[in-house]
């Protein structure tokens, strides 16, 4: 399963995709690496997305606010990798996500 996330500072929308078909969607608190630490992100995932831990997530595309440089992207990358157990990650800005959605 692939997860695609569109994150702002107040909420994150997550969507499962399997075999090219969009599946279930989830809403969690927003993730902005300027305001949330990596440990805070992992706690948030555990509290708000427990059903996705161990659910066979093979790849994640994360587009978010605050992902403005490599060090901020690395914070998000490490948290996602730790919680979901995959290293197949794309981390980009919310602006890139908006452009790709067109």
Place the predicted regions along the sequence by residue.
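Short amphipathic alpha-helix with an adjacent loop that forms part of the alpha/beta core around
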Residues: 42-52
């Amino acid at each position: 399963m692939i997860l695609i996330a569109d994150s702002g500072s107040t909420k994150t929308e997550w969507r499962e995709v399997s075999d090219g078909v969009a599946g279930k969607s989830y809403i969690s608190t927003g993730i902005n690496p300027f305001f949330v630490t990596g440990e805070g992100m992992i706690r948030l995932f555990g509290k708000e997305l427990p059903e996705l831990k161990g659910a066979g997530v093979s790849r994640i595309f994360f587009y978010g606010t605050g992902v403005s440089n490599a060090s901020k992207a690395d914070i998000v990358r490490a948290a996602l990798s730790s919680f979901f157990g995959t290293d197949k990650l794309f981390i980009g800005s919310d602006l890139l996500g908006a452009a790709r959605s067109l």
